[in-house]
Amino acid sequence: GLGDVYKRQDLIGKTPLVELGKYSASKGLETPVIAKVEFFNPGGSVKDRIALAMIEDAEQKGILKPGATIIEPTSGNTGVGLALVSAVKGYHLILTMPETMSVERRNLVKAYGAEVRLTSGKDGMPGAIKAAEELRDSIPGSVILGQFTNPANPAKHYATTGPEIWADTDGEIDIFVAGVGTGGTISGIAKYLKEQNPNVKVIAVAVSYTHL
């Protein structure tokens, strides 16, 4: 039978932890450094988690109807995750992004069936956001999921990524480090970890020109 054949969205999450032994040794660290291998997600990044979460949240709230159009301004991996989940669930996806984004990323989301609308590079993400809003206003029943402000983003990490890290380390975690884009990953995971142990130290890594 097909008992061991999974739908692609079922492969999102439950990623393994890998000990970075050589790195720890090179830095003379006594405590092991462990990485969560989020590129094992089918779309290749942690953003698969929130793509699935935001779409399912919109479905449950009745905001997103079957066969509707999803619109999202994105220059990163969220677009890949949304393209993957939209393809599986039968939604039309339009991604607005600055023309400065790589051709490889554009081709990847197109391979999943997404439509790409490029905006002026000099307008940056604000230009992509404006284009997305104009599209939403012109396409009946369309939805912008809004990863930067959508509570389903941190909630997904609180419900899944945080508990996975805690369980797989048997609670033996002193410091949690994460890169910051929307802030959803670090805030959701940190909330869960600190509820288990208030002494866990949380460190955010962000580029110098971050909006945070």
Residue positions per predicted region:
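PLP-dependent amino-acid enzyme catalytic core
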Residues: 4-212
